[in-house]
Amino acid sequence: MENITIKEIHARQILDSRGNPTVEADVFLSDGSAGRAMVPSGASTGSGEALELRDGDKNFYDGKGVMQAVRNVNTKISSLLVDKHVDQREIDQLMIQLDGTENKSNLGANAILAVSLALAKASTRAMKMPFYEYVAKIAGTSDRMSLPMPMMNVMNGGAHADWCTDFQEYMLMPIAATNINEAIRMGAETFHALKKVLKEKNYVTTVGDEGGYAPKVFGGNNEPLELICEAIERANYVVGKDIAIAMDIASSEFYEDGGYKLKTSGETKTSAEMIDWYEGLLEKYPIVSIEDGLAENDWEGWKVLTERLGNKLQLVGDDLFVTNVKLLQKGIDEKVGNAILIKPNQIGSLSETIDAVVLAQKSGYHTIMSHRSGETEDSAIAHLAVGLGTGQIKTGSLSRSERIAKYNELMRIAEANPELVLKNPFAEN
């Protein structure tokens, strides 16, 4: 690619799936290739995330405008990068240096990531290869390329659904599936069965930000698990054998003054009591993964959680690690968690996203490529999951087009490359 340069960069403000502004960028190369990328946005965010630059003008999209980030792309970033030779890591590094802050608060992680991913997409066209192959090539993960086992968010709570439960996500994992099409079908059939179960119990079937049902359940945080198990059986699958359950507790959202304040019950639990609770859930339900089971600042609690349950299930750090290699390395050194959620916009560039995945994989941590609750129709994470061989993907429910876009892209990738196998990190369970 040494003869190809960046010819033009242009950004604009568009809307995400919540109707909030976000950044879209186009990158044009000297050979005529072009790439476009859209950046998502989170609702429950870790304190260590790279900064999403917002305008703060209450008279313009209630302060959520991204015109400053757009201007940063169209002026500062464009001026720096136009006529530069195409090299993903070098270009990402130039933007990081131009920003000059630890959390990308000068230019905005939303500005940098939009250009980073748009450049990657333009580069794939210049190299005449699929996006996932380009990602694998620059990451050195070609031998790991595979289709990811989906985590399908069928019931929403917490910050994604007005606190109808304290826990944020209840997900299906179709662990008996042998290919991605079958995995998606199993999830869709169970999702539709769950709608029938909810209607029979007179629960509403409106959906939350990520497309999962969000009823105000009466049985507390455990009831969605009962409902999901019933739906799995209703869809003619075997609970725990065909389809298992994953949960995102998002506990940083209700961690206050050293305790876990449950809004639904009014109780406050200690770290030890939360761990006991999870242990009880494992005995009753086929749970294979718990994300953010304790808060991002509760490192001592996380050590105990990992010690007690780390050999029984996947313990995922999201707010804990925020796709940051420094925090991940700390977790590895201190034996905290055994898996990391990968969100490109938490760190703000493709190169740094790759670094987090590679470090995790080398250290024996599971990796899960993830969307955000405020999404777009951009399907880049499907390609990142395949190219980096993350083994798992978390991209919402079986409703809402911005979620389905990623599932559809995975099926297209599978059709185009029949040699890619569906990864199943839980096959041995």
PLM-predicted stretches and their roles:
Residues M1-T22:
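Short, Gly/Pro- and small/polar-rich lid/capping loops
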Residues P40-M129, I138, I184:
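Metal- or metallocofactor-binding catalytic centers and their adjacent structured scaffolds
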Residues G48, G140-T141, M145-G208:
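Mobile "lid/hinge" segments at catalytic clefts and subdomain interfaces of large enzymes
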Residues E169-I180, T205-N221, E253-T264:
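Active-site-proximal beta-alpha loop/turn segments in soluble metabolic enzymes
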Residues N222-N429:
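Catalytic core of soluble alpha/beta enzymes
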Residues I14-D16, N103-T124, M149-T165, D209-G212, ...:
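Conserved phosphate/anionic-ligand binding catalytic regions in large, soluble enzymes, centered on
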Residues Q13, V23-D31, A37-S41, M152-P174, ...:
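Short beta-strand elements
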